[in-house]
Every structure is written in structure tokens, then in C-alpha cells.
A protein has these predicted regions:
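Extracytoplasmic
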Residues: 9-43, 247-252
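Residue-level signature of mid-helix packing/kink "hotspots" within the transmembrane helices
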Residues: 26, 54-62, 112, 146-147, ...
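Extracytoplasmic gate region of multi-pass secondary transporters
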Residues: 28-29, 226-282, 344, 348
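Helix-breaking motifs and short loop linkers at transmembrane-helix boundaries and internal kinks
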Residues: 40, 72, 93-99, 110, ...
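Conserved MFS/SLC helix-loop-helix module at the cytosolic interface between two early adjacent transmembrane helices
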Residues: 59-98
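Cytoplasmic helix-loop-helix junction between adjacent transmembrane helices
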Residues: 103-141
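Helix-loop-helix hairpin linking two adjacent transmembrane segments in secondary transporters
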Residues: 138, 142-189
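C-terminal transmembrane helical hairpin of 12-TM major facilitator-type secondary transporters
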Residues: 299-347
Length: 430
């Protein structure tokens, strides 16, 4: 029986939102070589500026998830996109270290609800067996945005100045809000464009996924936040995001300073790793859902889909630390990003196996907060490594070590004890 496909329109809007989100976020890293010269920033100062974004971002990742649970993702996403687009445009007014630091910190507040609200939307709109694929597809928009940021923002900055580039990409976000308000609703049942068969299929899938939820109404959100499995998943996503955020912030500077590329070639080559990241998100999602369908232990299927690529990304980072020529370095960075994004979407899909749907936004926001502390730590650590501890290579080795910690946390801790429910098909603990 045909069930309709309108839910994929919502997925496309989430994909575009992710692309805009990461284009906005990556823009500063792309123009950093120019800003360094104009504003006279040291590597350690630049690292602090990159990290300042994540102070506000981490806090509102948690708050945004709770708001999405309470007020619905349609309203929260509209507010978030409008706020971060305006604040991104205000980055163009920065005149020195202090004003740049403040503008990036405020910008982070606006972007904070992005991933937890996306996760809430996927829970509302998609059946359980499509979770990893849709997380992978929508999150792949983030790497598309990062890939576009290199050539587009870089070339705009060369032609019209770096301040103009921030104003242009801010306008894109404000335009997206119009489409989101026109075509998206909080749930399929609220949309006149969704047929009865599609709506019933999604609702039946989610009801079957949480058989104990109706009898668990009194369980408060906080009981899910500090379970070992929730904390271990947060550590795993911390490891994933640590290097991704280092690359978003420092890859352009690494390409220009360590690999000696000019601005034009850097802008073009920086798109390669993020294109591979898009493949990792979407391809990893397809593979993760294939494992999910084939394996009887559903939680183990999600764990393996998250930990194997994270371990491979650590090996790629060690390789990056050992090379100093352009082609091997770009290929190894691209491999690391591919494996990291494949692991990322599997981590978010694992969340759906640990938490009832009614608490998913809040718990996702909490895990998102944990994981995005890496954005405060990672860029600053790379800046210190460049200035004081032997350059970029030592920073990449540290990233590989963080990956290892994430792999061990998820493999050894996530299991039946921290699950919010026991699925009928999940017969053994991983």
C-alpha cells in the first residue's frame, strides 16, 4: 500500500537548514587568513574566537531541545534561524578581537537549537526504520554547507571583502524561514498535505517503538539525562564533534599556513573534505539502517555503526599528522571527515533506541550540550598547539586520542542498563 512521501519535503527543508547553518558557521574559518591580517589576531586569539561560538551554542542546544518538546519544532526552528541569521550578519561589523569575540558568542546562542530540534522533527515525521537514513540525509546538508562555504565565501571575500560575505549568507537564512513556515508543521497530523496512510504509518511505527511509554508518564526528564548510556553517548559525540569543529575552524588556516596554499586554491580544496562528509552522513545512514534491519540486537547495530567509523577516523588523523604534502593531506583529512560524519548520524540514531519519543528533544539537547563542549575545547587546543606545542601535527594526534576515548565509552557503557525501553526484537544486551 502506498503511504505517501510528503515527509521527504520536510527532510529537504531540514537538509537546506543544515546547509545554511554550517555555511554561516564555517564562514569565519574560511576568511580567517584575511581577518588575521586586517585585525592582527594571534593563533591563540583566533582559537578563542572560534571557541566562543560554542559557549552560547552548547547552552542553547539543551534549552532548544526542551523548547522543541514544549512548543514544537516549527516555531523553535523559525526563531533559531532568524536569530542566528541576524547575528551572523552582525559579524560583518567586527573591528577587533573583542567585538569579534562577542559577535561569535551571540551567534552561537542562535544556532544552539539546530540539531536537537532537527532530531525532534525527525522523531515526529519519520518511522523508526528510516531514522538513521533521515538523520544522515538531513545532517549531510551541514557538510554541503561547509563545502559550499569554501569556494563561495572565499571568492566573495576576495572580490567584495569578507564583511560582504557574512551579509549575503545571513540573507539566505531569512529566506528559508518563509519556506519552513509554509510547508512544515510540528507533526504529520497537523498538515493538510499529508495523506491518511502516511500519517498512520508514521504513528504506528513510533507507537510500536515505545510500548511502555504510555505507562511511564511519571518518569521525569532528569531520570534519562544522567543514565550511563546517555552520558556515554554524549562522550562519543564529544569525540566526533571535537575534530569536526577543529576542521571547521582551522582547516582553511591549516591549508594556507602548513600546506602553503593561496586563498583561491584553499577555497576550492577545502570543499573536498566536506563533500566526503556529505557522503559519510548519507551513506553511513543507509548502512546503519541496513544493519538495523538485519541484526536482531538493535542497540548493538546502532553501536557498531557509531564506533567503527569513529575508530577509522582516529587512524586517518594519525595519518594527517605524519604528512606535509598537499594531496596526501587533503585525502586523509577527507577520509577523517567521512568517517566522523558516518559516526555522527549513527550516534544520533542510537538516541532513538535509548529514550522515549516524548523526551527525545530534551535528552538530545542535553547530549548536544555535552558534545558541543568539544567546540569550546577543540579550537582553543589547536590554537595553543599551533602557537606553543609543535604545530598542527600535535593537534591532530590529540584528536585521534579523543576519538579513542569516544569509541571505548560507547562500546563499554551503552547497553540495556541505560535504555529507556526494551524492544521486542532486542533480546541481548550489547
Amino acid at each position: 500500500m502506498k503511504t505517501g512521501k510528503y515527509r521527504y519535503v520536510v527532510a529537504l527543508l531540514l537538509f537546506i537548514a543544515g546547509a545554511i547553518n554550517y555555511m554561516d558557521r564555517a564562514a569565519l574559518g574560511v576568511v580567517a587568513p584575511i581577518i588575521n591580517k586586517q585585525l592582527g589576531l594571534s593563533p591563540s586569539q583566533l582559537g578563542v574566537v572560534f571557541s566562543s561560538f560554542f559557549f552560547g551554542y552548547s547552552i542553547f542546544a539543551f534549552v532548544g531541545g526542551q523548547l522543541a518538546d514544549k512548543y514544537g519544532p516549527r516555531r523553535v526552528f523559525s526563531w533559531a534561524m532568524g536569530t542566528w541569521s541576524i547575528l551572523c550578519g552582525l559579524t560583518a561589523a567586527a573591528t577587533g578581537f573583542g567585538t569579534l569575540l562577542i559577535s561569535r558568542a551571540l551567534f552561537g546562542f542562535g544556532e544552539g537549537p539546530m540539531n536537537s530540534t532537527t532530531n525532534r522533527t525527525i522523531t515526529n515525521w519519520f518511522p523508526r526504520h528510516e531514522t538513521a537514513t533521515m538523520v544522515g540525509f538531513t545532517f549531510s546538508g551541514q557538510t554541503v554547507g561547509s563545502a559550499i562555504a569554501g569556494p563561495v565565501v572565499g571568492l566573495i571575500a576576495i572580490a567584495y571583502g569578507w564583511r560582504t560575505s557574512f551579509l549575503i549568507i545571513a540573507a539566505l537564512g531569512l529566506t528559508w524561514i518563509v519556506a519552513w513556515r509554509m510547508f512544515a508543521t510540528d507533526k504529520p497530523a497537523q498538515s493538510a498535505r499529508v495523506g491518511a496512510a502516511e500519517r498512520e504509518m508514521v504513528e504506528a511505527s513510533r507507537s510500536a517503538a515505545h510500548p511502555a511509554e504510555g505507562g511511564d508518564e511519571s518518569t521525569p526528564l532528569r531520570s534519562y539525562l544522567f543514565r550511563p548510556s546517555t552520558l556515554a553517548l554524549g562522550v562519543g559525540l564529544f569525540a566526533v564533534n571535537y575534530t569536526l569543529f577543529v576542521f571547521i575552524s582551522w582547516m582553511p588556516s591549516y591549508f594556507t599556513n602548513a600546506l602553503h596554499l593561496d586563498m583561491q586554491h584553499m577555497s576550492i580544496l577545502s570543499a573536498v573534505p566536506w563533500a566526503c562528509g556529505g557522503i559519510g552522513y548519507f551513506g553511513g545512514g543507509l548502512l546503519a539502517d541496513a544493519c538495523f534491519k538485519r541484526m536482531s540486537n538493535k542497540l548493538l547495530a546502532r553501536k557498531l555503526s557509531a564506533t567503527v567509523p569513529l575508530a577509522l577516523s582516529g587512524l586517518a588523523l594519525l595519518g594527517v599528522s605524519m604528512v606535509d604534502s598537499v594531496i596526501p593531506a587533503v585525502l586523509l583529512v577527507a577520509s577523517a571527515v567521512l568517517f566522523l560524519t558516518a559516526s555522527s548520524q549513527a550516534c544520533w540514531a542510537t538516541m532513538h533506541e535509548l529514550v522515549p519519543g516524548r523526551h527525545l528533544g530534551g535528552v538530545s539537547g542535553f547530549v548536544h550540550l555535552m558534545s558541543n563542549i568539544s567546540g569550546i575545547v577543540g579550537p582553543t587546543m589547536m590554537g595553543l598547539a599551533v602557537q606553543y606545542f609543535g604545530g598542527y601535527s600535535s593537534g591532530f594526534v590529540l584528536g585521534a586520542a579523543v576519538d579513542l576515548v569516544g569509541v571505548l565509552a560507547m562500546l563499554l557503557v551503552i547497553g540495556r542498563r541505560g535504555a529507556a525501553r526494551t524492544d521486542e526484537t532486542q533480546t541481548t544486551a550489547a
